[in-house]
Amino acid sequence: MAKRSRRKVESATQAQDPDAPSPRQPCPCGSGRRYKNCHGSANASAPFVARPFEGLPGECDWIALREIVPAATAELSLRSDVDTDRSVRVCSLLPMAAPGLVRPDGTIWLGLQVQHNFGDVSRDLASVVERALETEPGNSIPAVGDPGPGNRMQDLVDPDSGFEVQVHDGFDFWVADVDDPSGEVAASLQAANDAAAPTTRLTGVETAYWTQMGDRRYLRWVLPHSEDTLLDALARLHAEGDDRLGEGTRLIGSFRAHGVLVPVWELDDEISAETLEEPAEAFAGRLDEALADSSSLSGAERSARAGLANRQLTIR
């Protein structure tokens, strides 16, 4: 009897969303729980959105600032129908990982690297912006529970605006207008600066970030293509030996983050961001050709694809 009831529950869950994972599969949010016990449960906090930044200007840079870039900012333009004269700055990380704050001049700072995720990151962030619009200058925006249904960032951000990222050496921009920061802010600033890995955004291609972590160097490239399509293309290049960015580089795997893949190359010690510019542009051309190839994968390419798939890590 219990088994029959369980099957009914599973069938009902899949009937609500035919594209949802099987109830017994891991939830795609990365919690480690089964889908039926996480975002697939009847009392789930919010529908899980696999690609929450899709449709925003600079989708891949949003992902980079949330997941892999320690210190960076970008100015945000809101839609004309959002009733405010305040400007918004997106920050990778704010002091004490705050969701947001309103500066003394009224500027809203929105933090991307936070400790909560209620299923739709875009909705979570929009809730912070909306609360900030009602907050007096000089106050932080505290973390709260599930914001519930409401506007997403796509409803607030001007779709025709840009999203120009500025990468910083550290987090001193937090206190650029403070003569002598002290207390919790100073301690948080010191800890954040100590942990920040040197990072540079390449200029010749989009959303590729060179970084040095300890004595190792990497290039992490957030790409907007569907995961399956990109994996096929990378497999074609790998089988031909065309997935390198020149001598001293090696494609070692990829991250899965917010609905897209982030291929990662390990680099020799002497390879800087500047020396990667030309090889990265050449690789982008090869990748475009591989993405346009719709033929079936060869045996070698299927083997390469399996290897690449086994070297993925979900970080959302």
Where would I find each of the regions flagged by the language model?
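Acidic/negatively charged segments and metal-coordination signatures
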Residues: 1-82, 91
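C-terminal structured domains
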Residues: 3-8, 37, 256-258, 264-316
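Short, Φ-rich (hydrophobic/aromatic) sequence segments
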Residues: 59-69, 116-121, 127-130, 234-236, ...
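Amphipathic, interaction-prone secondary-structure segments
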Residues: 78-107, 207, 243-244
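Generic recognition of long tandem-repeat/solenoid scaffolds
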Residues: 89-92, 108-112, 219-221, 263-265
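Internal, hydrophobic cores of structured domains that mediate oligomerization or house catalytic pockets
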Residues: 104-217
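Short glycine-rich, low-complexity/disordered patches
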Residues: 138-151, 165, 203-205, 244-255, ...
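A contiguous, surface-oriented mixed alpha/beta subdomain in the mid-to-C-terminal portion of proteins
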Residues: 170-280, 287, 294
